[in-house]
């Protein structure tokens, strides 16, 4: 059970989450084996040279800091996470919560119109399912209220779905929905999937991708006893025999860059106590059993690794033998309350493993330049990315950054006893282009959103000099601030101007170390609250995030991460800087 506060407005949660107290910009640490000091320095130098080459290569694509035009034919997907809380004000109780995810397509091109239409139909079907879920929960909630009125302790009911984009390229889009739910007895899990042909938007059936299903399930029989050798369950091929009569309508499956994965919930192949089974058959194990169109042919890829029971078999160390790669959640139990909560995640690659402390996270397997990496986007006190080289997983050194996948926007509203939290999340499906929020030296003020790519050394790189500020954090100037006036591209229009004391400013662009581009805003555009003897400001007029006019550029002096203007510390210049601790 995750320790989360569901009753805080999401805007405030986002601001606090992004807060950093006295944090310096981290150094990206090289992941190396047990080498001598000289060898380590040599590897570090090679990495820096590779990074520079990677950035130069991408700078040609992204000149003048303009948004990259999608020429790859790959769709990029946004996830619209929505959380509903149904409360009873009289008893101050949350009766139930429902979390669900809509699909949105970032691209507007005509070639993506069929896929966009399929997403719209998917979202409509989701609304119908939600209506039935609410109806069921309303019935359970009446029992909850009755228990509360009689003095019994109530348990919050919930249904929470996380969506994973297993593949999104010019041939296929594959989505896995993982739902955790409790209708009053105990926590349970279920999975659903849907797969699309990118060109036509057509929903793919299992036999559209796996043309020799008999051979596929024979391989699955062998794999299930490799990955789940300690349990005695029905063979996947026996289950498939009955499922084929309905054209595998009830089979949960996805297609990824690695291969095709089938998912069996607890109780399907065995007893409830046997847990679920997730089996992946790779394309390169027997390419002939798959439809050629959907066999992934590129050398680089990224796929999500769902923590708990998904195992992928790849050769991580180049010895010609496939290694089992998987991720597990780590838990502890409070001895008094018996509540179970996350304490971290553990990554396995063959005989190697490593633990990472966090209370939640997402894992992605990345293949780049013949090597395998695990990207661990985790959240503890702050959000971090650990980039783990699976060849050297036992190494003490780990490459980490104050980095996370981007959040487009977050909103909260309340109607009667129902609260709604909405956030639009970026996804990581393309090694050539993904959006992430990074804390540079200006991280004490806000995160910076940039377009990134995976470099040849496996770490995220960006050719953008500056990025967007989408957190909606605003400040009030405590003194006159000298600045320059610039246009959208950063060309100076007026070199000597100032923002007067008492002005409300909203940062919209910034680079990692030196400057932020701001606009002035009115109090009507903001939510203003008091705390610790000062006021804090967050944006409510979200249209301002899309402003494209001229800006005031405020330039800082940067002394190893300590920011000032003409020797005056930023805390004496701006009101509303949120810090932790």
What feature does the model see in each segment?
Residues 19-22:
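C-terminal motif of bacterial Sec signal peptides marking the signal peptidase cleavage site
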Residues 24-47, 51-316, 330, 361, ...:
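Compositionally biased intrinsically disordered regions enriched in Thr/Gly
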Residues 54-87, 255-308, 390-581:
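Acidic, small-residue rich beta-repeat scaffolds with periodic aromatic anchors
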Residues 178-183, 264-270, 327-334, 341-344, ...:
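Short, flexible beta-strand-to-coil junctions
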């Amino acid at each position: 059970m995750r320790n989360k506060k569901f009753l805080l407005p999401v805007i405030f949660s986002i601001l606090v989450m992004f807060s950093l107290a006295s944090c310096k910009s981290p150094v990206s640490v090289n992941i190396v084996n047990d080498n001598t000091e000289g060898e380590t320095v040599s590897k570090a130098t090679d990495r820096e040279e590779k990074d520079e080459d990677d950035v130069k290569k991408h700078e040609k694509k992204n000149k003048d800091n303009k948004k990259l035009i999608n020429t790859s034919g790959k769709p990029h997907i946004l996830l619209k996470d929505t959380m509903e809380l149904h409360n009873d004000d009289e008893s101050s109780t949350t009766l139930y919560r429902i979390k669900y995810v809509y699909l949105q397509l970032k691209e507007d091109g005509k070639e993506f119109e069929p896929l966009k239409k399929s997403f719209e139909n998917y979202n409509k079907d989701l609304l119908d399912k939600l209506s039935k879920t609410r109806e069921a929960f309303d019935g359970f909630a009446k029992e909850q209220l009755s228990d509360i009125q009689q003095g019994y302790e109530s348990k919050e009911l919930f249904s929470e779905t996380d969506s994973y984009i297993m593949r999104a390229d010019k041939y296929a889009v594959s989505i896995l929905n993982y739902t955790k739910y409790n209708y009053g007895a105990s926590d349970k899990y279920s999975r659903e999937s849907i797969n699309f042909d990118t060109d036509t938007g057509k929903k793919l059936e299992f036999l559209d991708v796996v043309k020799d299903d008999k051979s596929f399930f024979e391989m699955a029989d062998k794999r299930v006893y490799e990955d789940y050798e300690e349990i005695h369950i029905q063979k996947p091929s026996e289950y498939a025999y009955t499922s084929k009569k309905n054209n595998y309508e009830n089979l949960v499956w996805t297609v990824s860059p690695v291969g095709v994965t089938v998912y069996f919930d607890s109780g399907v192949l065995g007893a409830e106590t046997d847990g679920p089974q997730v089996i992946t058959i790779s394309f390169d194990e027997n390419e002939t059993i798959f439809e050629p169109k959907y066999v992934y042919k590129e050398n680089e890829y990224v796929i999500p690794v769902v923590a708990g029971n998904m195992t992928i078999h790849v050769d991580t160390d180049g010895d010609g033998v496939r290694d089992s790669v998987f991720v597990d959640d780590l838990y502890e139990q409070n001895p008094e309350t018996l509540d179970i909560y996350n304490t971290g995640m553990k990554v396995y690659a063959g005989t190697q493993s490593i633990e990472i402390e966090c209370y939640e996270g997402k894992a992605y397997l990345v293949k780049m330049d013949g090597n395998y990496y695990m990207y661990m986007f985790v959240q503890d006190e702050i959000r971090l990315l650990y980039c783990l080289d699976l060849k050297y997983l036992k190494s003490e050194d780990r490459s980490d950054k104050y980095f996370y996948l981007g959040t487009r926007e977050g909103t909260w509203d309340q109607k009667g006893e129902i609260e709604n939290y909405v956030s639009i999340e970026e996804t990581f499906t393309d090694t050539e282009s993904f959006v992430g929020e990074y804390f540079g030296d200006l991280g004490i003020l806000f995160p910076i959103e940039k377009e990134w790519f995976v470099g040849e050394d496996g770490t995220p790189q960006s050719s953008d000099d500056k990025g967007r500020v989408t957190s909606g954090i605003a400040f009030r100037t405590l003194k006159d601030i000298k600045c320059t006036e610039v246009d959208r591209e950063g060309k100076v229009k007026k070199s000597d101007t100032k923002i007067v004391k008492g002005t409300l400013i909203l940062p919209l662009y910034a680079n990692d170390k030196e400057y932020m581009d701001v606009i002035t805003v009115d109090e009507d555009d903001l939510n203003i609250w008091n705390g610790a003897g000062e006021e804090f400001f967050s944006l409510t007029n979200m249209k301002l995030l899309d402003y494209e006019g001229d800006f005031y550029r405020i330039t800082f002096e940067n002394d190893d991460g300590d920011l000032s203007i003409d020797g005056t510390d930023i805390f004496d210049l701006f009101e509303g800087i949120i810090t932790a601790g």
